[in-house]
């Protein structure tokens, strides 16, 4: 009786290939987190001293609406990082006081990150046995975002928090006398989060160019 020929490990190679393709998005996600962290640190390093922000000797009532508007225009570029921090804190406190809204936003953010932005283009999204194309995935995420932001309490919470933050910024900018303020020497145009956004856009373009022809349409 002839011996059976050895079985070629075809399934093992294909399984290993699929496993090697799964972490394709890991370097891109790590690069995104690294650029985000460095941009936040760079932006925070440009903030003004908080004691200067709350200096009572520099607080006075504006003489007119024109004077208040002029003060706001001069204070905004000078305290921009501090103002963004204040608005972010107001937004964070509002979300922490509403845990359900915070959970909904986190789920929505994770859906965008892991189902579309950093999902490998050669791995289609399969839910309940149905394969979704990239256009269908994008459409579902956009509709879900619209529903969450405009048809739930999340949208009103974000709007009210942002309005409170902007109100604090405008109130401080109108009452802070800017005569003793001066901007640093010509700063680069793209710094901090702006440079991060431009860099992220460039990275996304490079990643899209490097994907195979069978990737996203």
Swiss-Prot record:
Family the UniProt entry places it in: Belongs to the PRA1 family.
Membrane topology: Multi-pass membrane protein
UniProt keyword annotation of Ribosomal protein present: no
Localization, UniProt: Endosome membrane
Protein's recorded name: PRA1 family protein B3
Keywords attached to this entry: Endosome, Membrane, Transmembrane, Transmembrane helix, Transport
GO cellular component: endoplasmic reticulum; endosome membrane
Gene encoding the protein: PRA1B3
Entry-linked PANTHER family: PRA1 FAMILY PROTEIN B3 (PTHR19317:SF92), PRENYLATED RAB ACCEPTOR 1-RELATED (PTHR19317)
Subunit details: Interacts with PRA1B1, PRA1B2, PRA1B4, PRA1B5, PRA1B6 and PRA1E.
UniProt key word Transferase: no
Chain segments carrying region Disordered: 1-24
Function: May be involved in both secretory and endocytic intracellular trafficking in the endosomal/prevacuolar compartments.
Major place of residence: membrane
Tissue: Expressed in hypocotyls and shoot apex.
Record field: transmembrane: 76-96, 98-118, 138-158, 162-182, 193-213
UniProt cross-references to InterPro entries, sorted A to Z: Prenylated_rab_accept_PRA1 (IPR004895)
Entry superkingdom: Eukaryota
Pfam entry (one): PRA1
BP term (GO), one: vesicle-mediated transport
